[in-house]
Amino acid sequence: MAAKEIIFSDVARSRLVEGVNILANAVKVTLGPKGRNVVLERSFGSPVVTKDGVSVAKEIELSDRVQNIGAQLVKEVASRTSDAAGDGTTTATVLAQAIVREGQKYVAAGLNPLDLKRGIDKAVIAAIEELKKISKPTTTSKEIAQVATISANGEESIGQRIAEAIDRVGKEGVITVEDGKSLDDELDVVEGLQFDRGYLSPYFINDQDKQVAVLDNPFVLLHDRKVSNIRDLLPILEQVAKAGRPLLIIAEDVEGEALATLVVNNIRGILKTVAVKAPGFGDRRKALLEDIAILTGGQVIAEETGLSLEKATLAELGQAKRIEVGKENTTVIDGAGDSKNIEARVKQIRTQIEEATSDYDREKLQERVAKLAGGVAVIKVGGATEIEVKEKKDRVDDALHATRAAVEEGIVPGGGVALIRVKQAISGLKGANADQDAGIKIVLRALEEPLRQIVTNAGEEASVVVAKVAQGTGNFGYNAQTGEYGDLVQSGVLDPTKVTRTALQNASSVAGLLLTTDATVHEAPKDTPAAGQPGGPGAGGPGLDF
């Protein structure tokens, strides 16, 4: 086991704080509409230019081990805020730095760190209660666009794209972000339920231009096993042919004689059919088949449900207005399922989301809700170069998360103003003793810091602006984009309540831990062998020419 070095008390804390400051100073230059870019070196490929706080934080590793511990703790603040709210990472970093900086002064003066932390926690709880009071729900598409624009560093086109996507697929819909292939941003919306399985034979294609198979007003047969014997399918095929409508078969697989017969009947125009594999695997496949059954008003023909292919009737088949089957995707548009059954299914999946333990499971369940309740929108980010697209894509991701947070918990005035109003509301808060009062003061001072940093990045005098904003009430604040004072909600400078709340909670949590730290244990630096010693350059033995 490698030897460890241990550092105690003030020396440990001061070096941890140095690490906090190095990371925070690199991250906080990105805050606000006039924040600066940071260039990140890559070990391969071209450098990345970003204004995304968490992207900057994740790149930072310091050579001094103790400083690096401090930096990693603040990196944790940014990462946790990003995971929970998707935005607000720079605000969280700025708040953490301010709490650590102010707290360090009190600890050095001999105050009890544990009481300081209790005071900090008390002030943060009160601040969050006040935040909830001034929060208001997002109701309009315009407000959603404004939140997205602020999060995307003032780029209105991104805000409009995201608002349009939410309009099209609903608040439950899935919105994904991809690299585009043109200079402009594009929005693609898939209405209905889409899954990632295509036709099993290209002979099913009936739209040669688009290379897809289109079925109008089809029946949908859902089966959880392989189909290889055509005799199993004949009874239901005859019933569908009599009805004079096309048929989509979704099964574990369709192969051999069964697939060949379907293709021949399709080519001859006897019965228009398309066969596709069922999406997913294992239990997830069963769940997805059940989703499609509920959406189309059919049943999954399976041994578990007591149904068999040979005895299947039209009553057990699903129906839809239109189905498009491509090489890799199948889209079911306007399924004939009962809306009450669909709502009940969505409710059931939402319960599973709340109980899910892994992010992967939660994401897949959320996708299923979206496909049943709304649709899928894809924002394709355009740009002239790969670097530009990557930087813009980061901002679109931030904006998307911010809008989801705004829909979830509402909005507050942006530009650091909400925290100033919170500070005014809790300024009379008292702790159980003088040391706890000092902890409350630390938070009160830290609440000013995001506004101070936004103003500093805009090239103005922070103290003057903070004093003027503090004199105002409600939504009155400083718009760093225009350099003017006014009602920030009216001028569209908004922050999601969830983002501000999460940033404050995470910052105070990690900063409080740092202040109560009294020792660090880390790997001791390795001694490098001196020249001429064994293992070093010039070691004994025959010389080699290089």
Curated annotation (Swiss-Prot):
Its EC number is 5.6.1.7. The keyword Iron-sulfur does not apply. ATP binds at residues 30-33, 51, 87-91, 415, 495. Residues 533-546 have a biased composition (Gly residues). It catalyses: ATP + H2O + a folded polypeptide = ADP + phosphate + an unfolded polypeptide. PROSITE patterns: CHAPERONINS_CPN60 (PS00296). Its main location: cytoplasm. It holds the Pfam family Cpn60_TCP1. Keywords: ATP-binding, Chaperone, Cytoplasm, Isomerase, Nucleotide-binding. It is an enzyme of class 5 (isomerase). One of its GO terms (cellular component) is cytoplasm. One of its GO terms (molecular function) is unfolded protein binding. It is found in: Cytoplasm. One of its GO terms (biological process) is protein refolding. Residues 524-546 are annotated as: Disordered. The keyword Oxidoreductase does not apply. Belongs to the chaperonin (HSP60) family. PANTHER family: 60 KDA HEAT SHOCK PROTEIN, MITOCHONDRIAL (PTHR45633). Together with its co-chaperonin GroES, plays an essential role in assisting protein folding. The GroEL-GroES system forms a nano-cage that allows encapsulation of the non-native substrate proteins and provides a physical environment optimized to promote and accelerate protein folding. Forms a cylinder of 14 subunits composed of two heptameric rings stacked back-to-back. Interacts with the co-chaperonin GroES. This is Chaperonin GroEL 4. The gene is groEL4.
